[in-house]
A protein has these predicted regions:
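Mid-to-C-terminal alpha-helical segments outside catalytic/metal-binding sites
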Residues: 2-28, 32, 41-59, 109, ...
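Active-site neighborhood of phospho(di)ester-bond hydrolases with catalytic His/Asp-centered motifs
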Residues: 30-32, 61-64, 94-96, 121, ...
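Histidine-centered divalent metal-coordination motifs
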Residues: 33-37, 153
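Short beta->alpha connector loops
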Residues: 41-43, 66, 97-102, 123-126, ...
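Alpha-helical scaffolding within the catalytic cores
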Residues: 43-49, 75-80, 104-107, 174-176, ...
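Active-site gating/metal-coordination segments in enzymes
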Residues: 58-59, 67, 71-157
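Ligand-binding grooves and catalytic loops that recognize ribose/phosphate and carbohydrate rings
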Residues: 72-79, 133, 137, 157-158, ...
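Catalytic pocket-lining loop regions of alpha/beta-barrel enzymes
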Residues: 118-119, 132-234
């Protein structure tokens, strides 16, 4: 096999599934789990709005990787907004809050009133609080009072790839069941859930949205839909930690109907955003 033939066939293999996806989903393709900014522990692929558009992604709810370890939350959110404004409408900023910091209410006000954000993305494990603490319920209620949606990141990466001095356990999601029962109109999504979380800690959380970024295995989406409503499952890539093509290929390889595909790639995200 010569070099030119190898390159041509490899490129065709990479693009054919994405072309198949373009034929099955609607014109709108929303990624609910995208991030920008520097990650201090290793170099991540540099993905921007142009890279997303080339993959057919029309909108990406975007958080900041800087938010996990930076105390100046206001500056992090301001930089995120600047990046998203330059994306031509592709990237939708999801601000962060840290309830362990005294100015979290002011940070929330800025997110909504100054930046016009619709979503807050939370990292409880990196910011050092549990979902059963009163401060989380207080912050959740404050976010909901502003009419905003909430994303909770269950985990960022496998513990085996974490820096040995920064070992961060996944979020304990069990308290969400009672929290959501008491707040039936809350728009809450958990990102990066895996099969174990879905079948244990999140069982019965019927009003909760999840994404597909860490749903793995043969027939992963189909198996998830046996226990989770299609109306609450969204496309999420977890890029740039994961290559975005990974989640797109899950759709191509699935047996989802066109209606289910449209729900997962666009309709459900719009419902979460309240649009």
């Amino acid at each position: 096999m010569n070099r030119r033939f190898f390159i041509q066939t490899s490129a065709a293999a990479a693009t054919t599934p994405l072309l198949a996806l373009n034929q099955t989903h609607s014109a709108e393709l929303v990624d609910v789990n995208f991030a920008t900014g520097k990650w201090p522990f290793r170099e991540l692929p540099k993905l921007n709005s142009e890279a997303l558009k080339q993959l057919g992604i029309t909108r990406a709810i975007t958080g900041s990787l800087e938010a996990l370890l930076t105390r100046d939350v206001a500056a992090v959110n301001a930089r995120l907004v600047a990046v998203c404004k330059a994306s031509g409408g592709v990237m939708l900023a999801a601000g962060t809050l840290n309830p362990r910091l005294p100015a979290w209410r002011e940070d929330l006000r800025r997110c909504r009133e100054e930046h016009g954000m619709k979503v807050i993305r939370l990292h409880p494990n990196y910011h050092g609080y549990q979902l059963d603490e009163p401060l989380f319920a207080e912050m959740l209620d404050a976010i909901l009072e502003f009419g905003m949606a909430v994303q909770i990141v269950a985990q960022m990466e496998d513990h085996r790839t974490q820096h040995p001095l920064v070992q961060v356990a996944p979020v304990d999601l069990k308290p969400l069941h009672d929290l959501l029962q008491a707040r039936p109109k809350a728009r809450v999504m958990v990102l990066n859930t895996n099969a174990t979380m879905i079948t244990t800690a999140l069982r019965g959380c019927v009003s909760l949205w999840i994404d597909c970024a860490m749903i793995e295995g043969v027939g992963g989406l189909e198996n998830t839909l046996k226990i989770w409503p299609i109306e609450k499952l969204c496309l999420g890539t977890h890029a740039p930690f994961f290559y975005p093509e990974s989640s797109l290929l899950k759709l191509v390889e699935s047996d989802l109907s066109k209606t289910q595909m449209t729900s997962m790639t666009a309709v459900n995200a719009r419902a979460f955003l309240g649009t």
